[in-house]
Design a protein with these regions (language model features):
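Glycine-rich phosphate/pyrophosphate-binding loop
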Residues: 20, 28-29, 37-57, 61-64, ...
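Conserved N-terminal alpha-helix of the aminotransferase class I/II PLP-enzyme fold
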Residues: 33-82, 104-112
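Conserved C-terminal alpha-helix-loop-beta "cap" of PLP-dependent enzymes
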Residues: 275-361, 365
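Short amphipathic alpha-helical segments
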Residues: 43, 208, 242, 247, ...
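PLP-dependent enzyme catalytic core of the Aspartate aminotransferase-like
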Residues: 110, 119, 137-140, 317, ...
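Conserved PLP-enzyme active-site core in the AAT-like
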Residues: 12, 71-272, 277, 393
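Acidic-histidine catalytic/liganding microenvironments
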Residues: 65, 267-271, 319
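N-terminal glycine-rich, Lys/His-bearing helix-loop that initiates the first secondary-structure elements
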Residues: 1-45, 393-397
Length: 397
């Protein structure tokens, strides 16, 4: 029976009871190698650096969530991005990248791939015209995050996809914040969806992992070859935990979105909060695009309070329920200082131009009762206000 509804897909996509035992959950196939019936005759797997039965089930599940062939899963989200680069780029090639993106992506491009002759241009991907102007005859890939980390800036995927088709360039969309449940880049014209499965997809702070999804079978085969060659496949146990997390993904995202909406609305009304960034707010500059492109707004928001860096640091040190930690998209509410944590490797000029100021706070709203999250933020904001009065914010260096 086809899985036509999102909740049903999340529970059953790519999965069936184990034929050997009847176990309703996919087993963890913790095996290095697989016995072959004869030379060149096997049951689909030969060595777990190349493929693994548990990983393959997760790949089928993720692909089905986006009406695509099985995805390719990796040990981390950054391993997925690295494999994408190795599959597509050569010395002399050029990449156009959204100016606001994860610090690890910036590090990969600026510090690693540049040494192999790959050039990257970081541009304001909110404007399809700016993206189009940045494409050169050497451009092989446009890579955007939407919503972007940590400012939630949006890229019009359909418009940029049209630009890329016109130029003969592939478009990859980092869809980590939204997952296939809230946004489907391939349906909007993208060639590749990029995921850190560590985040919402697994959703319980239990794993690290990554995935690439595409409807281009030749590209998927190339990505599997790269993964086998560099040894970056996801482990069976991590895949099993991720499969378990996906079963509640739509349910969790509905709650994450509702809680984030409540917290964002409260922050926006707070007299000490100077800026709130959340696509679900009518005041968000790209709210109309969010309504058109997304099927929900997710659990991530960002905000600033009076007092800049001093106040922001004091707030993060004062939270009690919320946890000061990197990562996002799990059941616990996490608070992060992007400028010093997730985006610490991004040059200050690029950060500030993109709106990632020293005082910006990123909040991954969890599944705790929003009243408790709000109460914790409220007391932390008061502590931060007192700290800012005692020690005025220093001028930016």
């Amino acid at each position: 029976m086809p899985h036509t509804h999102e909740d049903t897909r999340a529970v059953h996509a790519g999965q069936a009871p184990d034929p050997a035992t009847g176990a309703i959950l996919t087993p963890i196939f913790q095996s290095t190698t697989y016995v072959q019936q004869a030379v060149g005759v096997h049951k689909g797997h030969t060595y777990s650096r190349a493929s693994n039965p548990t990983v393959s089930v997760l790949e089928a599940c993720l692909g089905e969530l986006e009406d695509a062939p099985p995805s390719v899963c990796f040990s981390t989200g950054m391993a997925a991005e690295t494999a994408l680069a190795l599959a597509l780029l050569r010395s002399g090639d050029h990449v156009v990248v959204s100016e606001v993106c994860y610090g690890g992506t910036v590090r990969l491009l600026r510090e690693i791939l540049s040494g192999f002759g790959v050039e990257a241009s970081f541009v304001d991907a909110k404007s399809p015209a700016v993206v189009a102007a940045a494409i050169t005859p050497r451009t092989r890939l446009v890579f955007v995050e939407t919503p972007a980390n940590p400012t939630l800036a949006l890229t019009d995927i359909a418009a940029v996809a049209a630009v890329c088709r016109q130029a003969g360039v592939l478009l990859a969309v980092d869809n980590t914040f939204q997952t296939p449940v809230l946004q489907r880049p391939l349906d909007l014209g993208a060639d590749i969806s990029v995921y850190s499965t560590t985040k919402h997809i697994e959703g319980h702070n239990s794993t690290v992992g990554g995935a690439l999804t595409s409807r281009d079978e030749a590209l998927l085969e190339r990505l599997r070859f790269v993964r086998k060659s560099v040894g970056s496949i996801q482990s069976p146990f991590e895949s099993w935990l991720t499969l378990r997390g996906i079963k509640t993904l739509p349910l969790r995202l509905r709650q994450h979105s509702a809680h984030a909406q409540a917290v964002a609305s409260w922050l926006e009304a707070h007299p000490r909060v100077t800026r709130v960034l959340y696509p679900g707010l009518p005041s968000f500059p790209q709210h109309e695009l969010a309504l058109r492109q997304q099927r929900g707004h997710g659990g991530i928001l960002a905000f600033e309070i009076e007092g800049g860096l001093v106040a922001g640091t004091a707030l993060m040190n004062a939270v009690r329920l919320c946890a000061l930690a990197e990562s996002l998209g799990a059941v616990e509410t996490l608070v992060t200082h992007p400028a010093s944590m997730t985006h610490g490797d991004v040059p200050r000029e690029q950060r500030e131009r993109a709106g990632v100021t020293d005082g910006l706070v990123r909040l991954s709203v969890g599944l705790e009762d929003p009243a408790d999250i709000i109460a914790d933020l409220g007391q932390a904001i008061e502590v931060a206000a007192a700290a800012a009065e005692e020690e005025p914010c220093p001028a930016a260096r």
